[in-house]
Structures are given as structure tokens and as C-alpha cells.
Amino acid sequence: FGNQQQLKSVADIVINHR
């Protein structure tokens, strides 16, 4: 399942954007 990795990437970007 590569969905978890994508979700982690999105979360990382969101955290970085904050």
C-alpha cells in the first residue's frame, strides 16, 4: 500500500507550510 507514504508526504508538506 503506497497510500500511507503519500499521506505522510502530504502531512509533511502541510506541517512545513505552517
UniProtKB/Swiss-Prot annotation:
Cofactor (UniProt): Ca(2+)
Molecular function, one GO term: metal ion binding
Range of residues in the leader sequence: none
Coiled-coil intervals: none
Cofactor note text: Binds 3 Ca(2+) ions per subunit.
Positions annotated to bind Ca(2+): 16
Keywords, in A-Z order: Calcium, Carbohydrate metabolism, Glycosidase, Hydrolase, Metal-binding
Domain of life: Eukaryota
Catalysed transformations (reactions): Endohydrolysis of (1->4)-alpha-D-glucosidic linkages in polysaccharides containing three or more (1->4)-alpha-linked D-glucose units
EC number: 3.2.1.1
Oligomer status and interactors: Monomer.
Entry's family note: Belongs to the glycosyl hydrolase 13 family.
Protein name, UniProt field: Alpha-amylase
Biological source species: Capsicum annuum (Capsicum pepper)
Record lineage: Eukaryota, Viridiplantae, Streptophyta, Embryophyta, Tracheophyta
